[in-house]
Amino acid sequence: MVDMKKRDAGKTIQEKANVLWDVANSLAGLYKPHEYGLVILPMAVVKRFHDCLLPTYAKVQKEFQAKKHLQVREAFLRKASGYNFYNTSKFTFETLLADAKNIGSNFRDYLNGFSDNVRDVLEQMKFEDQIATMEKGGVLYQVVSDFNSAKADMSPEKVATNDMGYIFENLVARFSESYDEQAGAHFTSRDIIYLMCDILTVFGTGRKGASKTVYDMTMGTSQMLTCMEDRLKEVDASVEVTNFGQEFNPFTFGIAKADMLIRGGNPDNMRYGNTLSDDKFSGFKFDYVISNPPFGIDWKVEAKAVEKEAALGDEGRFGVGLPSKSDGQMLFMLNGISKLKDDGRMAIIQNGSSLFSGDAGSGPSEIRRHIIENDWLEAIIQLPNDSFYNTGLKLCLQMHIAMCRLMHWRVSRFRFLYSSSFKGMNIEIMMPYIVAFRLRECMELKCL
C-alpha cells in the first residue's frame, strides 16, 4: 500500500505555497485580490520550468550555438536539456535582475526562448497580458525578484514532482476561493484520490509489465492522473502507464500540461476543451477512468451539442437519456462509461442527486436503469460531509465496471459502503470491507 508520508503534502509544501502566494504583496493595488492568481499561477509554472532547466543551461546554450544553422534542431536541444522542453534564451532569473531598466523586454526574450510546447502553455494562460500590466504598473521587476528568492526555489532537488503538483493545486484553490466560485468547482483531497486509486487497483493490474491507459475527463491540474500512475507503478513497477485528460479551465489546463512535460509524458494527451460539447477523445477506450466532475452546474450552454449527440442513440455517449439541464454530472458519468474498455474500471465522484433525481421514466431514471441492468455498478461509497473545498453537499464515490473478469458468475451485486464518519479515508480503512466482499464472492463462486 501507499506510504502514508507520500499522501501528506506536508508542512514544507504548505510553506512553499505560502511563499508563492505572498507575491500578492507586490501585486496589491495594481491587482484586485481575486486577480492575484492571474499572475502567480503562470509565474509559478515559468519558475518551475526555469529551475528544472537551470542545471543544463550552459549545455543548452552551447548546443544552440552549435546547431543554429540547422532548420531542425529540436531533438538536439531536448537531449541537451534532459527534458522534452528547453529554453535557448541567454537569460536566467538571476541575470534578468541585473538589468532593472530593461526587465520587460528581457523577460519577454526569456519567455520566447522556451520551446513551442511551453509557449503554448503560457499562451493558454494569457500570460502576455499580465506582463504588460505589470510592466506598465512598475511591479514586474519586483515580481521576478520575489520568484527568484531562495525560498521560492522550485528545482526538482528542492520540490519533488508530486509535491509540485500539490503546490499548484494549493495555489489554484486559493485563486478559486478568491473568486468565490460555485460549489461545483471543487478540489479533491489526497485521501479521497488515493482511496479511488487503491480501490481501482485492488484486483491488481493484470499481466505483469502490461500497458495501462488512464483517463480523467475533468482533470483540473491532473493530480488524479498523477496519483493513479504512481499507484499502478507501486502495484507493478514494470507497468507502462499512459495518461489522458481533458480540461476546460485554461489555468488548470496549463498547469496539467506543464506537469506532464516535466514528468516526461506526452503533453499532447492533455487536451483543452469542454468534455460535454467538444469530446477530444472520441472513439478512445481506456483501462481506467478516474474523475471528480462538477455537479450542480447546468449544461444549458452545451445543450445543443449534447442533444445532437443524444439523438445518435447508441452511436453517441448520451443516447440512454438526458438529466435536467440544471445539473450535468450524470452526463459526465455517461461519458466515462462510454470510454471504458470491456474490462475497464471507473471511479467517479457524484453528489447524492444522481441516485434519486427524476421521476420514473425520466432521463436520470433511464440512466440509472441502464447502468443497473447492464450490471455496470460495482459499488457506491458515501463520503464524509465537507469532503470537498467549497461545498457541504453529501457526496458519493461510485465504482463502475464495463465487464468484470468474473462477469459469467457475478450477477447484479453492487455494494454500498457508508463512510460518513470516516476521517482521513484511505485503503487501510476500507480494505477490511473490500476483503470481506471478495471473500464472500469467492465463497459464493465455490457454491455455484
Predicted regions and their residues:
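Non-catalytic, mostly N-terminal accessory regions of nucleic-acid modification and defense proteins
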Residues: M1-G204, N269-S277, Q382-N385, F414, ...
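A conserved structural/catalytic subdomain of Rossmann-like adenosyl-cofactor enzymes
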Residues: V2-R7, K11, D279, G283-L448
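Soluble or luminal CAZymes and related metallo-dependent hydrolases
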Residues: E15, V19, F248, G328
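Short, flexible loop/turn elements at secondary-structure junctions
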Residues: V45, T221, E247-P250, S387, ...
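A short, mixed-charge helix-start or loop-turn motif at secondary-structure junctions
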Residues: S178, S238-V239, R317-G319
